[in-house]
From Swiss-Prot:
The keyword Nucleus applies. This is Origin recognition complex subunit 4. ATP binds at residues 67-74. The gene is ORC4. Component of the origin recognition complex (ORC) that binds origins of replication. DNA-binding is ATP-dependent. The specific DNA sequences that define origins of replication have not been identified yet. ORC is required to assemble the pre-replication complex necessary to initiate DNA replication. Binds histone H3 and H4 trimethylation marks H3K9me3, H3K27me3 and H4K20me3. Component of ORC, a complex composed of at least 6 subunits: ORC1, ORC2, ORC3, ORC4, ORC5 and ORC6. ORC is regulated in a cell-cycle dependent manner. It is sequentially assembled at the exit from anaphase of mitosis and disassembled as cells enter S phase. Interacts with DBF4. Interacts with POLQ. Belongs to the ORC4 family. Gene3D superfamilies: P-loop containing nucleotide triphosphate hydrolases (3.40.50.300). One of its GO terms (molecular function) is DNA replication origin binding. CDD domains: AAA. It is found in: Nucleus.
Length: 436
């Protein structure tokens, strides 16, 4: 009987864990509009007022949201649209068109996507239009019920806005902004970009039709605010089905935020990037370790997640190299030390390696030159070294100038973790200069 009870309690616990993971993963991955905004309240107020003027009063406009990747541009617009759609009578009478510069790579594809999102495929049918502007104006005309006041407002959201500026003649941007300046269908054009020089990319005729409204997003919060965000992002909502479990989870999150080792991890993360996307990645990796037998996140989970986040990919490649390839990298390191980061060629590296072999008088490192050349080429394929200029057909491979793409710290850290690294090779790496 007791085994049955323990089985059922384990199943209930597993169900709670899966619900926790679903809620938090949705929060971390999909930037759910149900979450909170951090440090952008002023910008949010500006944006929502602009959208309301279009949706309620039929006022056309255009605006750019500018900020580095991960600063919350998409989250800001999603929150604003959610609030707008909750206003009575707005959701039925407003249309949204979402375009992305990475997907809609030219105006023709963009126009097809606009047609699809506005559900106007049946209106266009087999009609033939002379120009892009004619086609677009016909589509917008189809949305009109009568005069300006009764036309259906359209919100155009252009993600990766700077890529649309590279379209031929910027026809799409010109026509959308032209409509926003004229007394036609009420439209608001919202551009999302990470480029501060975006206005310099616009043609004069496009720039003259843009309202020059801009919202800048910069992650300017302090570490105490970052710690508060950490707590809020990990905490379960009050509507969680099991109150007792949610209370225990939130108490654990509170104790984590006060833990010294956790604060150190978060401080390191904060110093590298204030980007909330990188914080979400850290929390996601820690959340993956939660199981029915390990129901709460611990400080050790966060420390391990931080190690995974800050893992050096090039350093990891070095762990899988052969001893010969490691020796060549050490030879390059010494050449960099002697010649102060000047480029080197294979012959120089080979000579440096030979000094080590002769000094140690080891037959184990006595490789034929073609074998050493093959190892050198493998390092180039792994992109641990790169040629300084394009390879000429007639150029001898031994004398092509190369540059090492690892610094001394990366090499030494990788050697510390290298499995069964020979002692004399490690000593050679730590010697101040080469074997002169």
């Amino acid at each position: 009987m007791s085994s049955r009870k323990s089985k059922s309690s384990n199943l209930i616990q597993a169900d709670y864990i899966s619900q926790v993971q679903r809620i938090l993963r949705e929060r971390f991955c999909h930037q759910s509009p149900h979450g909170n905004l951090f440090g952008v309240q002023v910008q949010y107020k500006h944006l929502i007022e602009l959208l309301k003027r279009t949706a309620i009063h039929g006022e056309s406009n255009s605006i750019l949201i500018i900020g580095p990747r991960g600063s919350g541009k998409t989250m800001l617009i999603n929150h604003a649209l959610k609030e707008l759609m909750e206003i009575e009578g707005v959701s039925e009478n407003i249309l949204q068109v979402h375009l992305n510069g990475l997907l809609q790579i030219n105006d023709k594809i963009a126009l097809k996507e606009i047609t699809r999102q506005l559900n106007l495929e049946n209106v266009v049918g087999d009609k033939v239009f002379g120009s892009f502007a004619e086609n677009l104006s016909f589509l917008l005309e189809a949305l009109k019920k009568g005069d300006r006041t009764s036309s259906c407002p359209v919100i155009f959201i252009l993600d990766e806005f700077d890529l649309f500026a590279h379209h031929k003649n910027q026809t799409l941007l010109y026509n959308l902004l032209d409509i926003s300046q004229s007394a036609q269908t009420p439209v608001v054009i919202i551009g999302l970009t990470c480029r501060l020089d975006i206005l310099e990319l616009l043609e004069k005729r496009v720039k003259s039709r843009f309202s020059h409204r801009q919202i800048h997003l910069m992650n300017s919060f302090s570490f105490p605010q970052y710690l508060k965000i950490f707590k809020e992002q990990l905490s379960l909502p009050s509507v969680f089905p099991e109150e007792i479990f949610a209370e225990k989870w939130n108490e654990n999150v509170q104790s984590l935020s006060e833990d010294r080792s956790v604060k150190e991890v978060l401080q390191k993360h904060f110093n590298v990037s204030k980007n909330l996307r990188s914080l979400h990645m850290l929390l996601m990796l820690a959340l993956n370790r939660v199981t029915p037998s390990h129901p709460f996140i611990t400080a050790a989970d966060l420390m391990e997640a931080n190690q995974l986040c800050s893992m050096d990919s090039k350093g990891n490649i070095v762990h899988g190299l052969s001893v010969l390839e490691i020796c060549l990298i050490i030879a390059m390191k010494h050449l960099n030390d002697i010649y102060e980061e000047e480029p080197f060629n294979f012959q120089m590296v080979y000579n440096e390696f030979q000094k080590f072999v002769q000094r140690k008088a080891h037959s184990v490192y006595n490789f034929e030159k073609p074998v050493v050349m093959k190892a050198f080429e493998h390092l180039q394929q792994l992109e641990l070294i790169r040629p300084m200029e394009r390879t000429s057909v007639n150029a001898q491979r031994e004398y092509q100038l190369m540059k090492l793409l690892l610094d001394n710290t990366q090499i030494m850290n990788a050697l510390q973790k290298y499995p069964n690294c020979p002692t004399d090779v490690r000593q050679w790496a730590t010697s101040s200069l080469s074997w002169l």
